[in-house]
Amino acid sequence: MTRSEALFEQAKKTIPGGVNSPVRAFNGVGGSPLFIEKADGAYIYDADGKAYIDYVGSWGPMILGHNHPKIREAVLAAVHNGLSFGAPTELEVQMAEKVIAMVPSIEQVRMVSSGTEATMSAIRLARGFTNRDKILKFEGCYHGHADCLLVKAGSGALTLGQPSSPGIPEDFAKHTLTAVYNDLDSVRSLFEQYPTEISCIIIEPVAGNMNCIPPIPGFLEGLRSLCDEFGALLIIDEVMTGFRVSKSGAQGHYGVTPDLTTLGKVIGGGMPVGAFGGRKDVMQFIAPTGPVYQAGTLSGNPIAMSAGLAQMEALCEEGLYEALSAKTKRIAEGFKAAADKHGIPMAINYVGGMFGFFFTEQEHITRFDQVTKCNIEHFRTFYHGMLDEGVYLAPSAYEAGFLSMAHGEEELRLTLEAADRVLARMKAAN
């Protein structure tokens, strides 16, 4: 038994499922999860001391790589001044100014402690500002675990929301409408059915929780137009894509202006953090300037602000995003080339520092229903093969992969050579 396996057995005695977030349990791929002891650059190291080239990056925040010296130094310096004050700090102001400077649609921003808090608060604000109850989300998009957001569509059909987790009253879920991602007709149909009841659309501009699905041309622009036509707010959830797809997020990359934006992951440099911001007239509706209540004991935590500011400063380096995109393209297209070489059907998507691969004969994956038809057994086999080769991918066929600036030529080469060997073994076995 490895030390990771032993720790997992020990953890299950005191922690539900042995983990503090479900995907970490490896239920999507089978086997026992790795327990991580440390990380540096492009590598993570498990409890047995084995190194892995990491394409999870703490689920997105580690865009510069693990344990980056500038971030580490900023955190250590901040710790000497205290861990939390429960009062305003100059660091919060600096972070707000940095976010506003990088994302033109954000005129004011409120810091929180997680992505779930950010999306939950943005939706409450949208409901309060519009005085409407219903929200519109998309099948397969994840926006955190707030009650109103854990809702799915039935068989891809347009539907009044049904809870997708016990513990969510149907009275909550009925206000959540679910449309089909990358299908404007499904959105217009809901607006025509509820023309004065929908407060907002919330969307992942690149869906990263059904693997990696970019928007088709015109989709985000169409959502903007529909919101304008029916008086709803457009919330772009950039918790995952913010400052990962481009310096101004996915909204900058695709040229779409939302009313509100949610952020997380990258802006914390690896620390727990979230934020929501947007039009000043909307943001002024939040307490203490407005009637919509939102608060948080650790919001704007000085350690998180210090880490985030250090990372955000580094992201302004000229040519960084072009280099990151080139690395991502090489990995995604390298996986596809290896799969083609061995006659294993695969489709790929990638944008900025995010990528996804799908074991399927479908050529272009643009919707959630296509993702659910992919070969999960092939994914599991590939996943464990890569893990044995020292490459750590997201342990779920429904999660995106992430590159960092720490992934160099050697890491990319080793990863693609490993993929070639694993796919060759898969072909031989079949």
From Swiss-Prot:
Localization annotation: Cytoplasm
Catalysed reactions, semicolon-separated: (S)-4-amino-5-oxopentanoate = 5-aminolevulinate
Keywords for the protein's UniProt record, in alphabetical order: Cytoplasm, Isomerase, Porphyrin biosynthesis, Pyridoxal phosphate
Gene3D superfamilies: Aspartate Aminotransferase, domain 1, Type I PLP-dependent aspartate aminotransferase-like (Major domain)
Coiled coil: none
SUPFAM superfamilies hit by this protein: PLP-dependent transferases (SSF53383)
Protein name (database record): Glutamate-1-semialdehyde 2,1-aminomutase
Family to which this protein belongs: Belongs to the class-III pyridoxal-phosphate-dependent aminotransferase family. HemL subfamily.
Protein's GO biological process: protoporphyrinogen IX biosynthetic process
One Pfam entry name: Aminotran_3
A single GO molecular function term of this UniProt record: glutamate-1-semialdehyde 2,1-aminomutase activity
Gene: hemL
PTM sites of type N6-(pyridoxal phosphate)lysine: 265
